[in-house]
Amino acid sequence: MGGNSQPHQEPRRVNNDPRAKQQKGNQVRRDRRDVHGWVVLDKPIGMTSTQAVAVLKRLFNAKRAGHAGTLDPLASGGLPIALGEATKTVPFVMDGRKRYQFTVCWGEERDTDDIEGRVTATSELRPTREAILALLPRFTGVIEQIPPRYSAIKIQGERAYDLARDGEVVELAPRPVEIHRLTLVDQPDNDRAVFEAECGKGTYVRALARDMGRILGTYGHICALRRTLVGPFGENDMIPLDQLEALCDRAASGEGSLADALLPVETALDDIPALAVTRADAARLHRGQAVLLRGRDAPTCSGTVYVTVAGRLLALAEVGNGEIIPKRVFNLTGLTASPGRNERN
């Protein structure tokens, strides 16, 4: 806060009238604006995913925001943040593949399975490169994985990490996860090894480090972690926080637009077919009404599609039995991605 130039001032009075607080809250909500699109933040180490969403929401002064998959505070890299109507497409990103580059430190197991935890076991043994390479096929494909004790999984309504912090012994059941690719990238010294993993939804890289250490006859934990891919979003889509803040400053002075940082809402829908409709059919779908597919030129696709009209996203829909049934309708009034952002590097 800046200094006060007034030499004398009445004591600040706090208005505890709930109606006044409600009016103030309503004013804040009125001041927020409609912003629709994706921002792929290159999250810095030390920031939680929830904090990152709050920062983006403030920078864009957006009404709604949410992220597509938690990234641990100790990790850096891609955190896709949905603004406005893009929040309706979050599940499509969360179901996509993830790619991580991570460093395992050998010789210690920790209660969190990462460098922030308490050491629970130690070993003097260090795995050889040959032993590590021989192990990798065992962690490729569909495997059974026990999530870390410190995870967001619920046990009888309680988060596992809350129970663990309270000193309770948390027993988590193994669950199937899919690891599409696991490679050894580097071995800087005997104490560390750098890996890259491409995996499906629900995979814990921390558990991967723990289990590899145990099978190699030693212990291991994550000491560095970076996410480089989330669904359709790769490193070329990421924007560091300082660059985003600088863009916001330029936009505030009229030298740029925040739209330049947005990716279109439909970027999250890369893996499903698009279906173009006429303006008349678009009006029906927008009202929540089904549209019949008719004529020789009617599309033959079925299942989930995203519907466009005049090149603009309209709805998520299901196609079947000769009709289009709208499931989620998009209202893209407000700030959206710049036209050129549809073409990505």
Curated annotation (Swiss-Prot):
Family (UniProt): Belongs to the pseudouridine synthase TruB family. Type 1 subfamily.
Listed InterPro entries: PsdUridine_synth_cat_dom_sf (IPR020103), PsdUridine_synth_N (IPR002501), tRNA_psdUridine_synth_TruB (IPR014780), TruB_C (IPR032819)
Gene3D superfamilies (UniProt xref): Pseudouridine synthase (3.30.2350.10)
The protein, known as: tRNA pseudouridine synthase B
Family annotation (SUPFAM superfamilies): Pseudouridine synthase
Compositionally biased tracts (Basic and acidic residues): 9-20
Protein's GO biological process: mRNA pseudouridine synthesis; tRNA modification; tRNA pseudouridine synthesis
Region (Disordered): 1-33
Keywords: Isomerase, tRNA processing
Residues the record marks as active site: D72
Name of the encoding gene: truB
Function: Responsible for synthesis of pseudouridine from uracil-55 in the psi GC loop of transfer RNAs.
Organism: Bradyrhizobium diazoefficiens (strain JCM 10833 / BCRC 13528 / IAM 13628 / NBRC 14792 / USDA 110)
